[in-house]
Amino acid sequence: ISCSLVGSEMCIRDSIKRVQKYIGNETFMMTYGDGVCDVNIAELVKFHKQHGKLATLTAVVQEQQKGVLDIGQDNSVQAFREKSVNDGAIINAGYMVLEPEVFDTISGDDTIFEQAPLRELAAKGQLMSYVHRGFWQCMDTEREKSMLEKMWASGCAPWEVWNQQ
């Protein structure tokens, strides 16, 4: 396993291009590093190898953070639903398995990997999703960081799979 620490100010496009010379013709993994989960890496890689496409991203259901309102034409509240998994969107969890050919989708300095390259791969039928139904949590805010630190300190960190037997 090789890790590339590219700095917090570098965009993902530059991060990927910087490691290209180390990848060669090998399948590689990439993560954004701003989230934690208990995804089974071996199963993720196995899924990727079985379908034979250029890219696999890990997909999770992001639960709504707030209650949901159904509002009528006259602005009256027709229904109110508390947050529910069913109200969530399926999102990219940031854990990917990629083939070296994905470097060909990164064309220039203004290429944002999550936009043009992933859209191009999807349009060409070369992007698959591995749906993860276990624990996943982003760490984009101080609140999320604090929550994850409390989980870790309490010994209830579902992502700590290396200590599970």
Map each language-model feature to its residues:
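Single conserved hydrophobic/aromatic residue that forms the stacking wall/gate
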Residues: 1-7, 11-12
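Conserved catalytic core of Hanks-type protein kinase domains
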Residues: 4, 22, 121
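Catalytic-core segments of class I nucleotidyltransferases/pyrophosphorylases
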Residues: 27-29, 36, 42-49, 62-64, ...
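Extended acidic/charged loop-beta regions that coordinate divalent cations
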Residues: 72
